[in-house]
């Protein structure tokens, strides 16, 4: 094992370019966090006038974008913050990162030359102002490409066929439909685009000073890659746009090296020239790595701007909901993923409206209301939802004759409003009943062996208690809620090790036998409660899914 150890005194730097912020996490050779940094887009870069890191276009239904240059300037700023704190970049031997999934960046012709000849005396932002053919990047919250989704699915033989090829049916936020929209509506702009990157490969390109490959895991969120063969799918490419393969470049495994760090960073910040840049990947795959999720039967729930449920499987099973991606740290398995758009921002909206803008009041309401909420069920969508595919709106129901023992004779009555405490519980119960129902439908284990919760809301023990009650299992948390940038730093160490050995090394070799002494250790937060409660929640879940299916039939936007 000696040749698989990390050099003492070496550091591993992980970034997370997410929807609302950019984070940096530094791990030492014992895999302990020694430094973190944060740039919050709205407050640290107010000149871009974003709200929650995005622009919501009121003139085009569902169009949600972020200014590409803001991400560049955020990178300038986070590196400057590390430098101002006297961080020793020379000790960093590998860098990797995480990008919000599906978002795309469009480089104009000649930009590769600009990347290769960056002047270390000037900021990245100054030098890349004219590098993009599209100034505003479509992101995962965008739902303006329903037409393109249908066109792509029809071209390959239907939704299930596309899911078999790429791991997912067509989703509006996926990169393929977004590229098709550009191709169909702004053909000249598409033609003038030299390279199309994902947020992850875009950030890696800045670091290596040239176009970086898209990694195979993040590529599975594009509706363009053959998930079994790990190469671009000819059928999917042809269904999307002409001349696309050339604009996408090559694919690479997530654990591969993208290249050595560019001279720009060596001269400007003092990185060592041999520092390797490991392929960046998506935020959820990085969270999977950061949570050391490696056992089929474990589930992770990431609670952030989006909520995501993910797990691991050895089998490739296509489905019409959810997604299958290559596991970023194990070429022999897959990660399965369900994504919900109405997450922390929806929780905050109800906190502000019903709980005096206070989490303390919100939590008090959760504590003083009964499990099952006396049969009150709510559906709350402040954005067009992905799963289920429902438009903005709220729907509230009271179940009549619900004893908790069976659904016989139980009818739902739609109502206009709930009292504030019931509204708070209906939101949280509803969000997690929905997650349990969809994970079961997707073939994930029920009950799970355990759930690992991460993301901002995982710090809320009242929410964790409800998750435990609804799913009927123990709930663990990690020491820090920012598992994506932690996972990126861990993947930097893993990629460095694979590069040193010249072949794939299991990531568990990094922490086997010493997980408890690292920043990766999970802690038990809530023990599984009464199995009868979980079983009664199962009944409530079935009723909720009946109502959900009716809503989708009546209102479904896809």
From Swiss-Prot:
One of its GO terms (cellular component) is plastid. One of its GO terms (biological process) is D-xylose metabolic process. Mediates 1-deoxy-D-xylulose (DX) phosphorylation in the cytoplasm prior to the translocation of 1-deoxy-D-xylulose 5-phosphate into plastids. Can also phosphorylate D-xylulose (Xyl). Uses preferentially ATP as cosubstrate. CDD domains: ASKHA_NBD_FGGY_SpXK-like. Pathway: Isoprenoid biosynthesis; carotenoid biosynthesis. Belongs to the FGGY kinase family. Optimum temperature is 40 degrees Celsius (at pH 8). Active from 10 to 50 degrees Celsius. Its cofactor is a divalent metal cation. Gene3D superfamilies: 3.30.420.40. Its main location: cytoplasm. ATP binds at residues 305, 456-460. Disruption phenotype: Impaired xylulose kinase activity in cytoplasm. Hypersensitivity to D-xylulose (Xyl) leading to reduced seeds germination. Loss of remediation of photosynthetic pigments after oxo-clomazone-mediated bleaching, thus leading to albino plants. This is Xylulose kinase 2. Pfam families: FGGY_C, FGGY_N. One of its GO terms (molecular function) is ATP binding. Substrate binds at residues 16, 20-23, 111, 283. It is found in: Cytoplasm. It catalyses: D-xylulose + ATP = D-xylulose 5-phosphate + ADP + H(+). Its EC number is 2.7.1.17. It comes from Arabidopsis thaliana (Mouse-ear cress). Keywords: ATP-binding, Cytoplasm, Kinase, Nucleotide-binding, Transferase. It comes from the Eukaryota. Repressed by oxo-clomazone (keto-clomazone), a bleaching herbicide.
């Amino acid at each position: 094992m000696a040749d698989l150890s990390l050099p003492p005194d070496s550091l591993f730097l992980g970034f997370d370019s997410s929807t609302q912020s950019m984070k940096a996490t530094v791990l030492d050779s014992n895999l302990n966090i020694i430094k973190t940094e944060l740039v919050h887009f709205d407050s640290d870069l107010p000149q871009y006038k974003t709200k929650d890191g995005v622009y919501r276009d009121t003139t085009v239904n569902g169009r949600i974008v972020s200014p590409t240059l803001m991400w560049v300037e955020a990178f300038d700023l986070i590196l400057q913050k590390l430098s101002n704190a006297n961080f020793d970049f020379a000790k960093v031997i590998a860098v990797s990162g995480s990008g919000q999934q599906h978002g795309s960046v469009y480089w104009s012709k000649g930009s590769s030359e600009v990347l290769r000849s960056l002047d270390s005396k000037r900021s990245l932002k100054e030098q890349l102002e004219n590098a993009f053919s599209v100034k505003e990047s479509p992101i995962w919250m965008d739902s303006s490409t329903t037409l393109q989704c249908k066109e792509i699915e029809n071209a390959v033989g239907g939704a299930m066929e596309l899911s078999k090829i790429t791991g997912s049916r067509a989703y509006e936020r996926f990169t393929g439909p977004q590229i098709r929209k550009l191709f169909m509506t702004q053909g000249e702009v598409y033609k003038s685009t030299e390279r199309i990157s994902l947020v992850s490969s875009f950030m890696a390109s800045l670091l290596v000073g040239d176009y970086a490959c898209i990694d195979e895991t993040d590529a599975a969120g594009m509706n363009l890659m053959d998930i079994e063969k790990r190469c671009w799918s000819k059928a999917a490419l042809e269904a999307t746009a002409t001349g696309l393969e050339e604009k996408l470049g090559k694919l690479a495994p997530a654990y591969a090296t993208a290249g050595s760090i560019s001279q720009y960073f060596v001269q400007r910040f003092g990185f060592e020239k041999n520092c390797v840049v490991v392929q960046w990947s998506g935020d959820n795959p990085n969270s999977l790595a950061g949570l050391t999720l490696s056992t089929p039967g474990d589930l992770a729930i990431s609670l952030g701007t989006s909520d995501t449920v993910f797990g691991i499987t050895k089998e490739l099973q296509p489905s019409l909901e959810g997604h299958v991606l290559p596991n970023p740290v194990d070429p022999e398995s897959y990660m399965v993923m369900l994504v919900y758009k109405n997450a922390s921002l929806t929780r905050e909206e109800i906190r502000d409206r019903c709980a005096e803008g206070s989490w303390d009041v919100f939590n008090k309401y959760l504590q003083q209301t009964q499990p099952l909420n006396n049969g009150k069920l709510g559906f709350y969508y402040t954005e067009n939802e992905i799963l289920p595919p429902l438009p903005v709106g709220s729907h509230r129901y009271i179940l009549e004759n619900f004893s908790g023992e069976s659904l016989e004779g139980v009818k739902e009555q739609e109502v206009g409003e709930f009292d504030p405490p019931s509204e708070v519980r209906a939101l949280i119960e509803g969000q997690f009943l929905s997650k349990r129902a969809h994970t079961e439908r997707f073939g994930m284990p029920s009950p799970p062996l355990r759930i690992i919760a991460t993301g901002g809301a995982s710090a809320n023990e009242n929410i964790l208690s409800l998750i435990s009650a609804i799913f009927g299992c123990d709930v663990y948390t990690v020491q820090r809620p920012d598992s994506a940038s932690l996972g990126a730093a861990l993947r930097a160490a893993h990629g460095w090790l694979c590069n040193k050995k010249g072949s794939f090394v299991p990531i568990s070799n990094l922490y086997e036998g010493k997980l408890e002494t690292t920043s990766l250790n999970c802690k038990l937060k809530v023990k599984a409660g009464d199995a009868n409660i979980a079983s009664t929640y199962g009944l409530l879940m079935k009723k909720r899914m009946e109502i959900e299916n009716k809503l989708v039939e009546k209102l479904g936007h896809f």
